[in-house]
Amino acid sequence: MYDYIRGVLTYISSSTMVIESQGLGFSIFAPERWLIELSSQLHRELIVYTYTVVRETEHVLYGFHTRGERECFRMLISFSGVGPKTGLAILNTFSLSQLCSIARAEDIKAIASVPGIGKKTAEKLMVDLKQKLADLLPLDAQILASWEPAKPSCMEEGIQALAALGYPKSSAERMIAEAMSELPDHASVAEILPIALKKNLQGLNKI
């Protein structure tokens, strides 16, 4: 299985891209909204994180902008009734941050808004998402921690990241402060965010 493919983007359609690498053209299915973003990147080199689905007659590649998105896709298609097509539709509708927020809020209506997902499937999917929330949060923190703004303090950057996930500022400040109290002074945002999210989830489970 490929972890990623580095190559030149030579073609884009509404559902696929072609990456040329070492003389081979890889046809890769990807979320439509990422493909739209890539429309200005034709003939440029990029890295695509891939997941391979093996069928009887073919191997199908699915591609994502980050490892976190790829792992989220892997998680989604492990759920009953969710195949690759539906998994892509979910990631095309929601970012990983939004999925985390939806799972916390148990927003079944939001899940049911994804093309191809009815109310009953949405209800089942919500149960699965809630059970896997602890796995989703570190993936989302990994993506958020890759931001590189104009070097605010770790606390400020952590608070901004949690605010982007939908946490109120007061909650974000408390979560970051608690996480930082357990880590060395030189801890990075990439280390702080997973601890903050994990501790908050543990607190919710005690309620």
UniProtKB/Swiss-Prot annotation:
Residues 145-155 are annotated as: Flexible linker. NCBIfam families: ruvA. Residues 66-144 are annotated as: Domain II. GO terms for biological process: DNA recombination; DNA repair. One of its GO terms (cellular component) is Holliday junction helicase complex. Transmembrane segments: none annotated. The RuvA-RuvB-RuvC complex processes Holliday junction (HJ) DNA during genetic recombination and DNA repair, while the RuvA-RuvB complex plays an important role in the rescue of blocked DNA replication forks via replication fork reversal (RFR). RuvA specifically binds to HJ cruciform DNA, conferring on it an open structure. The RuvB hexamer acts as an ATP-dependent pump, pulling dsDNA into and through the RuvAB complex. HJ branch migration allows RuvC to scan DNA until it finds its consensus sequence, where it cleaves and resolves the cruciform DNA. It comes from the Bacteria. GO terms for molecular function: ATP binding; four-way junction DNA binding; four-way junction helicase activity. Signal peptide: none annotated. It is found in: Cytoplasm. InterPro entries: DNA_helicase_Holl-junc_RuvA_I, Hlx-hairpin-Hlx_DNA-bd_motif, NA-bd_OB-fold, RuvA, RuvA_2-like, RuvA_C, RuvA_C_sf. Has three domains with a flexible linker between the domains II and III and assumes an 'L' shape. Domain III is highly mobile and contacts RuvB. This is Holliday junction branch migration complex subunit RuvA. Homotetramer. Forms an RuvA(8)-RuvB(12)-Holliday junction (HJ) complex. HJ DNA is sandwiched between 2 RuvA tetramers; dsDNA enters through RuvA and exits via RuvB. An RuvB hexamer assembles on each DNA strand where it exits the tetramer. Each RuvB hexamer is contacted by two RuvA subunits (via domain III) on 2 adjacent RuvB subunits; this complex drives branch migration. In the full resolvosome a probable DNA-RuvA(4)-RuvB(12)-RuvC(2) complex forms which resolves the HJ.
